[in-house]
């Protein structure tokens, strides 16, 4: 009788199958933590705005619901003035940021200028400077009485006077320090743009200016708008620059008004 060899297959446990629940568990834990850190403070802020009492100390009661706080804010002339100043400062700063950021992007991407790497680094350098430091630095340079630029101009006999403790001063500093947002968006759009489109326009007889106006600019316009919106929103939340440059001139924006 011939002996027949039989093989026995043993199914080993699939470690990967056993650990499939780990990503879901970590995702769920992360969602819970983020919900607590974000949703809970936001909910308490909303409840506090809709009640006339402190919900943390006195508890939350439906009878305390009121829009009185919103009416006080809406009818406060100081809030309206601060809001108007914020829109002017941030709107003007956004325009300056677009001019500077677009110029830097065009020079870096579309020209053969030397030291392009240095220029590209300078284009994002303001992002590494805290707003409060930026305000103090420019106040040292542009103070109306003791500013370094004014003192140098006085010694040189140049009829030059600069005062950054003004609305144009804030707009100027805002534009310089938040131009990198426009620069990064626009430079990326210029690099990723299909050059054959501009070549086709030139072959068709379009001038460089017409090609820029009808081909290049429409293609990078979404990037410019994205940089503008981001710059504007970030400027609205900045405290350092308005506190240093606006407060001495009694120019109050929303961020400084909240802290006063």
Predicted feature locations:
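Transmembrane alpha-helical segments of polytopic membrane transport and secretion proteins
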Residues: 1-31, 209
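Feature of multi-pass inner-membrane transport and sensor proteins
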Residues: 2-9, 194-195, 210, 247-255
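A short amphipathic helical element positioned immediately N-terminal to and/or at the very start
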Residues: 11-14, 65-74
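Membrane-water interface segments at the C-terminal ends of transmembrane alpha-helices
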Residues: 22-56, 71-191, 217-240, 244
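Glycine-rich helix-loop "coupling/hinge" segments at transmembrane-helix boundaries
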Residues: 57-59, 143, 240-260
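Short coil/turn motifs that cap or connect alpha-helices
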Residues: 114, 206-207
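Glycine/proline-centered hinge or cleavage motifs at structural transition points of membrane proteins
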Residues: 204-206, 218
């Amino acid at each position: 009788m011939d002996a027949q060899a039989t093989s026995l297959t043993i199914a080993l446990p699939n470690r990967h199958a056993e650990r499939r629940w780990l990503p879901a568990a970590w995702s769920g834990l992360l969602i819970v933590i983020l919900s607590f850190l974000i949703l809970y403070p936001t909910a308490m802020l909303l409840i506090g705005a809709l009640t006339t009492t402190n919900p943390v100390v006195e508890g939350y009661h439906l009878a305390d619901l009121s829009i009185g706080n919103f009416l006080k804010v809406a009818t406060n002339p100081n809030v309206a003035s601060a809001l108007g100043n914020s829109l002017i400062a941030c709107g003007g700063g956004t325009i300056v940021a677009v001019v500077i950021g677009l110029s830097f992007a065009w020079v870096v991407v579309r020209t053969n200028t030397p030291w392009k790497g240095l220029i590209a680094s300078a284009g994002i350098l303001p992002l590494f400077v805290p707003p409060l430091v930026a305000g103090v630095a420019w106040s040292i340079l542009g103070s109306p009485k003791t500013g370094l630029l004014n003192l140098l101009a006085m010694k040189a006999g140049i009829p030059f006077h600069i005062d950054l403790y003004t609305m144009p001063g804030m707009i100027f500093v805002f534009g310089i320090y938040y131009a990198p947002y426009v620069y990064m968006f626009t430079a990326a759009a210029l690099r990723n743009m299909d050059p054959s489109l501009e070549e086709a326009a030139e072959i068709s007889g379009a001038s460089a200016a017409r090609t820029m106006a009808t081909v290049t600019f429409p293609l990078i316009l979404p990037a410019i708008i994205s940089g503008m919106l981001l710059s504007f929103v970030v400027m609205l939340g900045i405290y350092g620059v308005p506190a240093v440059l606006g407060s001495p001139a009694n120019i109050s924006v929303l961020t400084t008004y909240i802290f006063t």
